[in-house]
Amino acid sequence: MKTMSEELKKDKYNIQDIIKILPHRYPFILIDRIDEVKPGEFVNAIKNVTINEPYFQGHFPGQPVMPGVLSLESIAQTTAFLMLYELDDPLKKNMFISGVDGVRFGV
């Protein structure tokens, strides 16, 4: 019989798979799918961003830009996913970033 962690480990993940592992939910889940995971090396995650995102109404009207802090949060969620992926039982842990240094946002 497979353990929960073995059942969770696969090549690709859709949003239903991701929310089984990460605690985030709509509207703050900022990963839509994961196309590839190489433990200890990288994870390839996708967030589908459309003009319909609510933050585009005010950031910036007529010139929409995804807020940098949301890009950073997406990276944090992807990192947490990779860290949890490498655990034997990912459902018993949560990952949090306690700080970020030297980050700059610009165009």
Question: What residues fall within each predicted segment?
Answer:
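Hydrophobic beta-strand-centered segment that forms part of the acyl-chain substrate-binding groove
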Residues: 2-12, 79-107
